[in-house]
Amino acid sequence: MYLVSLDAGTNMYFKVTGILLTITVGLVTGSFLDRKDLFKILLRDYQKDLAPAGKGGGPVVVYHSLFVNAFESLENNVLTLQTWEWMSWNDNRLQWDLGSYGDEKTLIIPSKLVWQPDILLMNSVEQFTGFAAGDLNVLVYHDGNVTFVPIRHSKTLCPFSMESIYRENEVNCSLKYMSWTHSSKTLDTHSTFQTVQHLSQMTPNRLWEIVDTKAERNAIDVLVLQHRSISRN
């Protein structure tokens, strides 16, 4: 994402894992009783703490994107944004036959009742308060596809110096998202789009302007090392 300073001619490059926000809702033709029965059947033996399996028993594929709602600030090496975080995946435990429930194509379920991917902004400067807002809903389709769009207020570490701005006329910031506990064997993350999308009514910033964007997917191996210091009493 390129950000240009409106008063100093400064460009900023901002790399994100993805951006999108488009929800397609099918026409609801069933009755309340159909939805009530479907709700009970789907969640009766459902285990929300167990991740769904992907195709052929492989990892569940999570499509992840961001949608910028407001560009609040870039100061003190911190980029502050208001975003809608779009996530979608398939959970085969949440499938149903259309003909059995009044042709219900979708069902709205509280997000706290179903499995959610533990995807975090890894270079956030804020204290961790939870993976997602439990009072938001997910949209479940009859084929098991799930769409979840929580609202985020993110503060991301973006190191830069005024000398580098004057010398290179740009700043490079990255938003890095990944699963906190899953490896690629159980959860595979994909970016839906290669560019960042913005809400048409996005609140602009007085000093900076977004002029270009980019999204990348990277596969990395993470090695966790523990160091302990022991002193004699």
Predicted regions, residues:
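Classical eukaryotic N-terminal signal peptides for Sec-dependent ER targeting/secretion
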Residues: 1-22
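Non-transmembrane, solvent-exposed beta-strand/loop segments in proteins
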Residues: 24-233
